[in-house]
From Swiss-Prot:
Belongs to the GlnE family. This is Bifunctional glutamine synthetase adenylyltransferase/adenylyl-removing enzyme. Residues 449-951 are annotated as: Adenylyl transferase. It catalyses: [glutamine synthetase]-O(4)-(5'-adenylyl)-L-tyrosine + phosphate = [glutamine synthetase]-L-tyrosine + ADP; [glutamine synthetase]-L-tyrosine + ATP = [glutamine synthetase]-O(4)-(5'-adenylyl)-L-tyrosine + diphosphate. Gene3D superfamilies: 1.20.120.1510, Beta Polymerase, domain 2 (3.30.460.10), Glutamine synthase adenylyltransferase GlnE (1.10.4050.10), Nucleotidyltransferases domain 2 (1.20.120.330).
Length: 951
């Protein structure tokens, strides 16, 4: 054993003092002191439970003792009579065994592979013991779940990730998926329950038993987000539902996750075998699948962006050459060739690497390097986490914890340990780059950039600039020199360090080479400098622009085209990561993919870290809006598609925000008890205005109205039970809070809930009955106009159907046309007086006569006027399809409908482009003359005061 360094000797003296104050002070051996000095967790536990130290002396930890964990746990649970006692027993058992594992790990009586086995077996034993105990309790309370033949149905649990691979780290969450074989009902209970309801309740109680924090701590943080549909999906699925999902909707990343999936309990019963056989074809393809490399490259890019986003430094899991890259290297071979090579279907990493060597897929020396680096990094990770039983992979920067890790790894000091770590991670990085690394090569030093070095490093005269910018006028050259000089002066006032200065000196000649040849060089450079000033002290982003020349070109192109994009990049430099893949940059996601992409994005953030979740939502929105704007700028997306994408993006975010708010509320109060017998959550959100009409712009707010479906006498089923309707009110308030909270990435959306019944004076959440009553008996005509553009954007199927029926019923009312005309016209005049430009030389595209609002009012008037005789006119909430319907049902001529649509789309397109230029919707008075004449003619035809009824 190495002698303890000075930092640990000081720690040892403190520990001796604390143990000497116990009622029966133990005799501490040298090895005891070494372990206690390395781990606050172990010393804290042994001070609380000094008898465990005596047990360590009498029965020292053995490498293979994991084989007895289940037996020991059965003894610990033998006297447990209720759930509270179960929670206590599980937590004490976990602490006791984790102390033994940490002890064995520090003293190296167990190797790293054996430690990983111990940690994984402990978790599996506790999951299975808790499941089996709770299954019996649930069967007594609810009846036994059976299939249609009366055969009892079990709960099967897939352990994912490191748990599935038998490689769990010291302080880890556990990723689980719950499944049951067949649908059916419970038998023997007071009343029948569907199997889905039984297993959902069992699953909820199991998660609580493992995850809930009590005075004794917790057992494991349980993460269920890898299940089909993530948080928004059922907690437990039948085999048939699982199979349908993975066959029809399984994503690449779910396939990779399933490589390590393992049934907990090692069961070989027919149901377990059936589930394994069902999943195997999804994971391992029969053909050689080289698409894996690009998919894994994309995943690695996502992780690299995550490292930058969270400012992670010295991260031995996610950093270059870290644990994750070794896992990716191994998975490449498993996923490409695993379908044909059974030896590659191992869940554990080290045996898979051995198979890679035996199959000649990598040189033996590289496999040896990877295996050695993996064991080194995993031991370091476990020692790091054992210090305080905390889930971290970031190396410490304080001397005490550095000394702990250096000694635990067998090095004299931190410097020696750091050198060894760097060598291991570099060896991994070499293999990773060869196999998976980025396709974009560094461009090297372009000789032409030498011409521009003097422009950055020397003080040039205007005449010196002429050869570099022959196309610019003298005034433009003077402006360019002044801009560069000002930027240089600003940089000199910043503390950027020698590395930052070196990278900036590489970047600026490259940037000038691209910018100076442009006709809009001054505009481009002034916008780029705003970005550069925001990142000049963040070397990571400067390096990104140096290393990826394509990214630099995209930055210049987008900033030149749009000050909105330039200011977004300057405010949120994380968005620069989006420029690395031009294919995705100019090609936004498929509209149906936003929900799944956001789900993947949020999976990388701890579920219980609200601040990180809020940041991630905002960053996802900004990244996707950048991609949409890039498609808009390059005209890859027409105006209608821009709004469609912005609307689908908003809906995905609404879904995720409600999910987060729901989880937080249920954790605090439980869920309303009536949901146990119903489908969905008894909650819905109506989108009004631009959201309802599929017309969102880049800075649009969201007009939302909240509905609930909850009987009066319902309470929530949590420990802090509250009235069910109060629960939904607080849920809506929480949703509003999550949208509006300002983080370092800004707010998510401005949300306006004033279109609810009775406006600001009304309840934030309405029952569906109250909403219907208000619309029938109290709503003004303008509120019925708003209803034309309303649709459900989130909600249970029942509420969705009820709202659609109410909306159609209200819109299909018979209305007296002269009165309807007058009320629509008066509301329009009121808006025009309030919002119009009132300047002769200005035309406000939105608010002035002949503009977009007139077109919207014409569409709304026509629906309210004619839906009574043709209910199908209420189907759509967007103007374009409303006009199509008017032509289809012979209410409006096809020529007029097409002309109004053209006018509407043309003006909407201009508003989008003005937004990209950070300009308002006010333009010169002679703009859109033809379109305004068409709108005015249609307004006069349908809504002018002196017209007779037109039918």
């Amino acid at each position: 054993m190495l002698p303890l360094p000075s930092e640990l000797q000081i720690q040892a003296q403190s520990i001796k003092q604390r143990f000497s104050e116990l009622p029966a002070p133990p005799d501490l051996r040298d090895e005891d002191i070494a372990v206690l000095a390395l781990s606050d967790f172990v010393s804290d536990m042994l001070l609380i439970h000094p008898q465990w130290l005596e047990e360590l002396h009498q029965q020292p930890p053995q490498p293979q003792e994991w084989q007895y964990y289940s037996q020991w746990l059965s003894q610990a649970l033998a006297g447990v009579q209720d759930e509270a006692a179960l929670l206590t027993a599980l937590r004490l058992f976990r602490r006791r065994v984790m102390v033994r594992i940490a002890w064995s790990q520090v003293l190296q009586t167990s190797g790293t592979a054996e430690t990983l086995q111990q940690l994984s077996t402990l978790a599996e034993s506790m999951i299975i013991a808790a499941r089996d105990w709770l299954y019996q309790v649930c069967c007594r309370e609810l009846g036994t779940p059976c299939n249609r033949q009366g055969v009892p149905q079990p709960l099967l649990i897939l352990g994912m990730g490191k748990l599935g691979g038998g490689e769990l780290n010291f302080s880890s969450d556990i990723d689980l998926i719950f499944a049951y074989p067949e649908n059916g009902q419970t038998q023997g209970g007071r009343r029948e329950l569907d199997n889905a309801q039984f297993f959902t309740r069992l699953g909820q109680r199991l998660i609580k038993a493992l995850d809930q924090h009590t005075i004794d701590g917790f057992v494991y943080r349980v993460d269920m987000r890898l299940r089909p549909f993530g948080d928004s999906g059922p907690l437990v699925l039948s085999f048939a539902a699982l199979e349908d999902y993975y066959q029809e909707q399984g994503r690449d990343w779910e396939r990779y996750a399933m490589v390590k999936a393992r049934l907990m309990g090692g069961a070989d019963d027919p149901y377990s075998q059936e589930l394994r056989q069902m999943l195997r074809p999804f994971v391992f393809r029969r053909y050689i699948d080289f698409s894996v490399i690009q998919s894994l490259r994309n995943m690695k890019g996502m992780i690299a962006r995550e490292v930058r986003r969270r400012g992670l430094k010295d991260n031995i899991k996610l950093g270059a050459g870290g644990i994750r890259e070794i896992e990716f290297i191994t998975q490449v071979f498993q996923l490409i060739r695993g379908g044909r090579e059974p030896r590659l279907q191992e869940r554990a990493l080290l045996p898979t690497l051995q198979a890679v060597a035996e199959l000649g897929l990598l040189p033996e020396q590289q496999v040896a390097d990877l295996s050695g680096s993996y064991l080194f990094l995993r031991r370091l990770e476990n020692l790091l986490q054992a210090i305080a039983d905390e889930q971290t992979q970031t190396l410490p920067n304080d001397p005490l914890n550095q000394a702990r890790l250096a000694w635990g790894m067998g090095y004299a000091d931190w410097a020696a340990m750091s050198t060894a770590l760097e060598n291991h991670m570099q060896a991994v990085r070499v293999v990773f780059d060869d196999l998976i690394g980025d396709e974009t090569p560094d461009i090297g030093e372009d000789p032409s950039h030498g011409l521009y070095k003097s422009l950055w490093q020397d003080v040039l005269e205007e005449s010196d600039l002429a050869p570099l910018t022959p196309h610019l006028e003298e005034a433009a050259r003077r402006q360019l020199l002044a801009t560069i000089s000002g930027f240089r002066h600003d940089v000199d006032k910043r503390t950027i360090g020698p590395r930052g200065r070196e990278v900036l000196d590489q970047l600026m000649p490259r940037l000038f080479a691209e910018v100076c040849s442009r006709p809009d060089a001054n505009v481009a450079l002034s916008r780029l400098i705003l970005l550069l000033l925001s990142i000049v002290t963040r070397t990571t982003y400067l390096e990104l622009l140096v290393e990826y020349h394509a990214a630099l070109k995209h930055v210049i192109r987008l900033c030149s085209a749009s000050p909105m994009v330039a200011s977004q990049l300057a405010r949120y430099p994380l968005l620069l990561d989006e420029l690395l893949d031009p294919q995705s940059l100019y090609q936004p996601l498929a509209p149906s993919a936003y929900r799944d992409e956001l789900r993947q994005y949020l999976l990388r953030v701890p579920e219980d870290d609200e601040e990180q979740q809020l940041e991630a939502l905002r960053q996802f929105k900004q990244a996707q809006q950048l991609r949409i704007a890039a498609g808009d700028i390059t005209e890859a997306l027409p105006v209608m598609k821009v709004s469609d994408h912005l609307t689908y993006l908003a809906e995905a975010i609404i879904d995720a925000v409600i999910q987060q708010a729901w989880n937080q509320m249920v954790a605090r109060y439980g869920q309303p008890s009536h949901l146990q017998q119903s489908e969905g959550r008894g909650f819905a959100v109506i989108g009004y205005g631009k959201l309802g009409g599929w017309e969102l712009g880049y800075s649009s707010d969201l007009d939302l109205v909240f509905l609930l479906d909850c009987p009066l006498d319902v309470m929530t089923d949590g420990d802090r039970s509250i009235d069910g309707r109060q629960f939904y009110l607080r849920l809506a308030q929480r949703i509003m809070h999550l949208f509006s909270t300002r983080t370092s990435s800004g707010i998510l959306y401005e949300v306006d809930a004033r279109l609810r019944p009775s406006g600001e004076a009304g309840m934030l959440v309405s029952t569906i009955e109250a909403f219907a009553d208000y619309q029938r008996n109290e709503a003004w005509t303008w509120e019925h106009q708003a209803l034309v553009r309303a649709r459900i954007v989130y909600g249970s199927p029942k509420l969705h159907q009820q709202f659609d029926a109410i909306r159609q019923q209200i819109l299909c009312r018979h209305r007296e046309d002269p009165q309807l005309q007058q009320e629509v016209r008066e509301m329009r005049e009121k808006m025009r007086n309030h919002l119009g430009s009132k300047q002769r030389d200005i035309f406000d595209i939105k608010a002035d006569a002949g503009g977009i609002t007139d077109i919207e009012f014409i569409a709304q008037y026509l629906v309210l006027r004619y839906a009574a005789s043709e209910p199908r006119l209420t189907r759509w909430s967007d103007n374009v399809r409303i006009f199509e319907s008017m032509a289809h049902y012979d209410i409006m001529s096809p020529e007029e409908a097409a002309a109004l649509t053209r006018a509407y789309v043309t003006m909407r397109d201009e508003i989008h482009h003005l937004a990209l230029q950070e300009q308002s919707s006010k333009v010169a008075a002679d703009s859109f003359i033809a379109e305004r004449e068409q709108v005015a003619a249609s307004w006069h035809k349908w809504l002018a005061a002196n017209d007779a009824n037109v039918s």
